[in-house]
Structures are given as C-alpha cells and as structure tokens.
C-alpha cells in the first residue's frame, strides 16, 4: 500500500465521513416544481421565433414589476396581492410539491384569481387569453378552490401595455368539478415525466452507495478526491494546482458524484473552456458508468456550432425546425432521456434530426432531467448565456461546479462582464431607420451626440495607448435608457425590414452596456479609445471579475477550480473567487523527474530590443542542438506569428527545413486544419518533426500527445502579452491597489502560457521528454519563483553546451 492508501480504503473512508443515507425506504422522494414551469413545459406549442428584441431587458422587467404593483394598488381592499399557493400531491412512489404565487386574489361573490401580464404588445387587439397564461392562472385557481372548499371560482387574465398602460381583461368562471377535471388532465400529462424522475433518482442513489474509484490511486490523486469531497460537504470553494497526468478530471468528478449520494448535491456542472476537455469529462463519467454508476449527463454545444442550418436564424420562415418545434420537442426529449445515459453532441444531433427540432433548444431542455451537465463556462457565468432555468437572480440550487482549466476563466470572465459601444454604430443604424421611425432616429441621434461629447474629451488620436479614463458616463446612460425602450418597441412592431439584424445587434449592445453599467463598482474602469479602424468607443472594463463570479457561484453550494497552472494561487483566488481564505491544495507531479530535462538558455532573449536576425540565428541553432539530441517530434512555441514567420523564413534559408520536417501553425486554422496538423504527429518518419506554434495558441494547451507523439517542447520568450491600452489599464489599476501591476497585467498571464506549453510533454508514466526555455529572463528570481516545485533541477544551458547537455540526458535516461 502506498502512502495515498488503496482505492477501497479511500472509498470506505468517504462512506464513513459522509454517513451516506439509503434511498429513503420510509420517506417518499419529493419532486418540487413551480406552477409556471409545469404549464410552460406541458402546454407549450408552436414555433421558435427570435424576431423580437429577445427576452425583456432588465429595464422592461423593472417596468413590468412597477406596473404589476400599480395595477394591484388600484384594486381596492378586497384585492389581496402576491398570494403564495402550494399543494402536495401524493402518488405511490413519490410526492409532487406544486407551488406558485398568484398576482392577486379578489374577494367577490365568486372568488377571482388574477394573473397579470405586462408587455409592449398591443393588448387591445387580444381576443382571448394566451393558453399558457390561462393555464397558469387555472392551476392557482384549482389550488385555492380545493383548499377553501369552493364550488366555483373565477380566473381573470389581466394584460397591460407598458407604454400606454391600456388594460384588457378576460374572465372565465369554472365550477370546481370543471377545474378539477382540467387540472387532473394536466397532471396526467406530467405523470410520465414524474415517474421517470423518481425511478432514475432511486437507481442513481442505489448505484452511488456501491461506487468505488475506478483505478488504483496515483500519487496525489487520493488527496484530490478527499479534498474535493470534504470541500463540497463543507460548502467551500477550493483551488487545485495539479500537474498534467494526475487525473484531475476523474479525481474531481468521482467525489462530486459521491456528494450527490449524500443528498448534498443535486446536479454537477462540469465547466470547460475547450471542446477537447468536454470529451475528457464525458469519458470520465462513462468510466464510472462501466463501474456500476447510474448517472445521466448531457453535453451542451454552442448554438452556432450545433445548428444544422447555414445561418443561425431562429424563426419559422427561415428554419423548418423552428416551425412547430414546441409541438414536437417533448416527444423527442422523452425518447432521448429514456434511451440514453451519456447524451453527447452526436446523440443530440441524431434525435434532433429524427424529430426535426432545434438541437440546441432540445439540449437545454434535456439538461433539466440530467444529473450532470458538461458545458462551457458561459452557461454558468455569462450574464446572457447562463442557463436562466437554474441561475435566475435570487434562486439557488444544490449544484457543484467543477471548473476545468480554471486559469482560462480570468480573461473569459473579464470579457463576460465588460461592455463596449462604438460611436459609428449609432450613425449606421440611424441611416437604416430614419425613414421608418422618427422617434428611433431621434433617440439614436441623441446617443451619437453624447458619444461625440466624450470623443472630444479623449486625449488620443494616433498616439499609442491613448485611452482616456472616464469618471462617469451618466448623460450617455440616460440617453441609452431612452433608446433601449424605443428600440425594443420598434423591433417588436417591425419584424421584417432590410438590415434589421444590424439594428437588433445595436439593441443588444445597448442592453448589455446598460446591464453591465449596473454592475460597475471599484473593480471596473470606464475608458474611451479608438479601435484599429479609427472608430471611437466607450468601454466598461471589468478588471477584477471575482465579485461577479462570486454572485454566480453562490447559486450553487461549492466550486472547485482546477488546473495544471494555477500559480501563484493567491492571484487566482483574488480574481476568481475574491476570497483569499478559500481552500487550496498543491499536488506534486507523479512522474519520475529523471525522465525529463528542463533547461533554461541563458544567452538568448525574445525582448523587443533583441529581435533581429542575429538573435534569430542563435535561437535557430539552439533549437537544432536540442532537437539533434534525439529523433522524434517536437513543438517550438513562439511569442508571435511574426517571429514564427521570420524564423521559419530563416530556417528555409539556413537549410534547417532540409534537416527536419517543419509544419507551421497559421493564424486562421479551421477545426479540420487543426486536426490535420495534430495528425502529423502520429506518422512515423525518417527524420524529426518540428511543429512551429504560437505560445498561448490552440496547440499550447488542451492537446494530448502521449508517449512518443511529442518528446520536446521548446519555448521562446516569457509569454508576456503585448503592451496595449487594456494591459496598461490593468497594470495601473493594480499598482494603485497596492499590488505589483506588472505581475498582474503581464508576468502572471505570460508564465501561465509558458507552463501550459511545457505541459504538452510528459503526459504518462511512460513518457520521456525535454522542456527548453529560451530566454535569459527565466533565470531571474521573479520568474523562477513561478516555476512548479518539480522544476527544482532545472539545467542552465547556452548556445555552446546545449547539444551536449541534451544528448547526455537522452543517453542515460
């Protein structure tokens, strides 16, 4: 037995620590569902149609809430507003808790249940209540009538226009027998879904009781498993720094599944930044299924990627799947969930084709019935892409978030919580709508004038890093608020016109800006500048996204951040969770350090002042010396495409490409080209293969070239991001907040790219390889202190002894 313990011992300890319950022989399983979710799921029909301004903006929702209260306040003392209604429905093997809140109960001769819906549509043209709205009110009416022993009850639908405040009402009186028969018919439709949920729950919980870790633990792996498990049960976030090859995916998924078995977690969200890591997560869940786990997962794919149409235009006139989608989708969902456990992209596409439904929308609905959801960060953290069904403001769930390759989340989150407006877009849209709506045209003109005023304040014209920090943009925001309301109504009233998509795009940009503006605090910088086209823009730049991410994390119970490159961990704590006291563990590499050589070349540098042909020749010679030590496959990572191209041209001239086969990454590789590039590393060759790649690009992380597919990673430069306005803003911001601004803006992001590229080598116990860092700056303490602990045996080389040291390594390895 090693010091990490055997698999069975660890599983027994987890059982003891959890005091895992049984499946509940004496207590029925409970299904909780809201009235609104019930009727919207069971009674939906018709088409997908995106030819509106989309979901109501926060401003419109706020206006709707105000209108609700206004209407309720006018109704008199007999009107009781916001009445919570709930009922427990007992079935053989489970109980359904149905709950909702009626907008109003009116005490008249016949009690009236009032349901209010506010909108920008012309409600005076309505001839009857919409079916789903009526059904929601009827459910409330049934619950109230049953609990108050009423013979009759009235349902009132109140529709109100947010612009004109015009109101139209529809009243229907039901006997209790009528509404009971109707309600039972609705529940009869839902029962097959409830039966499925209850049966799956029992099978899942039973299987978890006997689930063991599927492998013998590697060094450090048990530590991850136990730490993740304890953190979830303690409802604490944790950061896990663990090198490639430890098995981070299975080591986080397994304890999260065991936590599901305790009842502390209902659903696991496995969050990734790249498609390849989603596949690894799918495989990990599949390994557990082969070991007896009954656990259903779905992988969500971006709409643009999974859409089968040439253009992603979601309306019945442009897409045959959108037409009648909601008439067919429930049958498709039931077929999928009753026949599949691992619902991958391919599975989604297969059933979506069969039932002619939108694969993206179907996958979101399927997630409701799943135990695990594998998806991009966006679906949990992005304010617009996040799954509203789980992460609506004020609603929490028993969710565990597993964040893979968490180092990527810093920049992704900055993008999610920033917003930008470009002055020229207002002028372009004004030209489109000027003959259609004077009101919209005037609102656009007002915003353009506000942008022009800010432009005059901008100190820059053609100077580098000529941004201007803005203390406030309140006048612009007021104009944007008026424009948003005007555009929302205009787009709802005008479903088809030339260049409508451009107007819709501006509407979304304005809405995003206003929503993000509400989040602006001390962790934001508002600035203006000119883009590469010379266009003036204003940006709300989120320099520290931790507060926004924390709001999202609080919708679940615990978040596990893990990566091979979370150094220094306090930097990531500060920018991701905002809590320096969050748990953290460091896992040492399980691999034999004698099987790899890490070296630093002391007489080259990629500094801008040193970028010349002489320096490039020296770099090329060192690459030749490193590669000559052993025939095989290598990757060389350059700090930019420009340097890659310059050195490649030099390699041709110097005869380097005759000695070795060289393939170059290009700036616009499609998925197929990426696969072809990686496939070159699978072919046996007479001479060494060298891939010229860009540091921080698609081949420097997230690829898995095991065994002899890659035996060397040569990294040129320290990975520092290019100096630009936003990097300088970050640097100044952190300097002003008592941090080392250069570290936060440049050094830490750069070293992360270096460590990721180095991690492409040594993926398994059988691997051998060399990692060569070609830049004298790596010898400095401020860089070496960012090295992983296992790099304590780094060798210093130069252009004279590099070949000798590398050949010595390969001779005795």
Which residues does each PLM region occupy?
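Mg2+/Mn2+-dependent nuclease catalytic core
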Residues: 87-181
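Walker A/P-loop
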Residues: 234-254
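Signature of the SF2 helicase/ATPase Hel1-core->accessory helical subdomain module
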Residues: 355-356, 360-372, 377-478, 566-578, ...
